[in-house]
């Protein structure tokens, strides 16, 4: 039987890779809905190719333009817009599988709607778990949803863990690998001069601009530690980060008997996407086989928290609990956007996040409203802090010494 997919964030990097895998297996997958924010032209191209029943965009103007182009091409895809439309296609009876690939906090509510509707969820939107934590996981468990991680690291951990959760007691710790990004060996003092284009040039992975910056600051790895805590029900002190520049080993699980299991593969997101789409089966992803002899050498090192203060901030937020992780994520989104638009320098990203975490009171997250309120407060605080920075400080100051 074909799986019927809603793809949230189809025009982004994960969306592209997902559709590449889907196109290789038309007998297995049917695209029910595609969603984008404002990239209407690309969404039209995708709709003409995959003929979904529904397309969703962020606003009425984009919806009108997309609908007109689809009608002119004879495509019968219905077009909707706005946050509620995202929720609707995520919980619709028209799909059984939701690929959650919207970047940032905007992906939380549709992902949560999919969980409450008992869908099979392929989670690429780590922010959903970072922000809502137990609220999201409770929705998954209470409604019989199936949660499959798409992030390469978490997908690797999932593959290395025993299928039966009762056997997870033999797990000693999990180890998330990180490439170290484009600035792993760069002199720390020179990081104040980093440009957005430099930060977006990842040495191994093809990603969108926001996640590329997060990789460069290693905030992405920090968010992944928080995500792993919720996905695999392990405390932060049993989740390690290991720098692995080649991005061949995607993560590892260490067991009580001294065994360590690892998942390896070429650095291409189509591999974890194909695994999650077809699970428990295996299908062709379009990714070439790994040639270890050609790679010849794999290297590892501990993360440098002085060079990567954002990683330390994420660890701090996880330890504090409550809404701290939601505030961390929100402040980081605002700071990264300010960096990409050249309002602040690269090293000021961590400064903004640290200031927001220190300025806002923490509290327990007992409802989605608590999470949304913390997110909004952190965004306001981040904007205010950036607006109050002297021009020089915006470029040079560091957050964590």
From Swiss-Prot:
GO molecular function: 1-deoxy-D-xylulose-5-phosphate reductoisomerase activity; manganese ion binding; NADPH binding
Swiss-Prot/TrEMBL keywords: Isoprene biosynthesis, Manganese, Metal-binding, NADP, Oxidoreductase
Gene3D superfamilies: 1.10.1740.10, NAD(P)-binding Rossmann-like Domain
EC assignment: 1.1.1.267
Annotated positions binding 1-deoxy-D-xylulose 5-phosphate: 126, 152-153, 179, 202, 215, 220-221, 224
Disulfide bonding pattern of the chain: none
Residues bound to Mn(2+): 151, 153, 224
GO biological process, any: isopentenyl diphosphate biosynthetic process, methylerythritol 4-phosphate pathway involved in terpenoid biosynthetic process
Broadest EC class assigned to this enzyme: oxidoreductase
Family classification: Belongs to the DXR family.
Purpose: Catalyzes the NADPH-dependent rearrangement and reduction of 1-deoxy-D-xylulose-5-phosphate (DXP) to 2-C-methyl-D-erythritol 4-phosphate (MEP).
Family annotation (HAMAP family): DXP_reductoisom
Matching NCBIfam families: Dxr, PRK05447.1-1, PRK12464.1
Record protein name field: 1-deoxy-D-xylulose 5-phosphate reductoisomerase
């Amino acid at each position: 039987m074909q799986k019927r997919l809603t793809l949230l964030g189809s025009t982004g990097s994960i969306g592209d890779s997902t559709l590449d895998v889907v196109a290789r297996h038309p007998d297995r997958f049917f695209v029910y809905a595609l969603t984008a924010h404002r990239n209407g032209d690309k969404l039209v191209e995708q709709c003409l190719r995959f003929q979904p029943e529904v397309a969703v965009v962020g606003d009425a103007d984009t919806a009108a333009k997309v609908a007109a182009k689809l009608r002119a091409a004879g495509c019968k895809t219905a077009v909707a817009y706005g946050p509620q439309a995202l929720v609707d296609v995520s919980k619709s009876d028209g799909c059984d599988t939701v690929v959650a690939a919207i970047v940032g906090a905007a992906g939380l509510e549709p992902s949560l709607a999919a969980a409450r509707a008992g869908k099979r969820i392929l989670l690429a939107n780590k922010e959903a778990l970072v922000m809502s934590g137990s609220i999201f996981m409770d929705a998954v468990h209470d409604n019989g949803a199936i949660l499959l991680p798409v992030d390469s690291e978490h997908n690797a951990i999932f593959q290395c863990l025993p299928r039966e959760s009762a056997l997870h007691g033999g797990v000693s710790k999990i180890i998330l690998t990180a490439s170290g990004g484009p600035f792993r060996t760069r002199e720390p003092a020179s990081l104040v001069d980093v440009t957005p284009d430099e930060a977006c040039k990842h040495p191994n992975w093809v990603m969108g601009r926001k996640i590329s910056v997060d990789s460069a600051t290693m905030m992405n790895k920090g968010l992944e530690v928080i995500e792993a805590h919720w996905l695999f029900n392990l405390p932060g002190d049993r989740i390690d980060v290991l720098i692995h520049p080649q991005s061949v080993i995607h993560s590892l699980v260490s067991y009580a008997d001294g065994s360590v299991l690892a998942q390896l593969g070429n650095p291409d997101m189509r591999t974890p996407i194909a695994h999650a789409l077809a699970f428990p089966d295996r299908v062709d992803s379009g990714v070439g086989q790994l040639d270890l002899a050609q790679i010849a050498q794999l290297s590892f090192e501990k993360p440098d928290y002085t060079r990567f203060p954002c990683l330390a901030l994420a660890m701090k937020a996880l330890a504090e609990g409550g809404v701290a992780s939601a505030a961390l994520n929100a402040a980081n989104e605002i700071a990264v956007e300010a960096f990409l638009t050249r309002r602040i320098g690269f090293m000021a990203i961590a400064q903004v996040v640290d200031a927001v975490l220190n300025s806002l009171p923490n509290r327990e997250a007992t409802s989605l409203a608590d999470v949304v309120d913390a997110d909004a407060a952190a965004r306001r605080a981040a904007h205010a802090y950036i607006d109050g920075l002297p021009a020089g400080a915006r470029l040079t100051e560091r957050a964590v010494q």
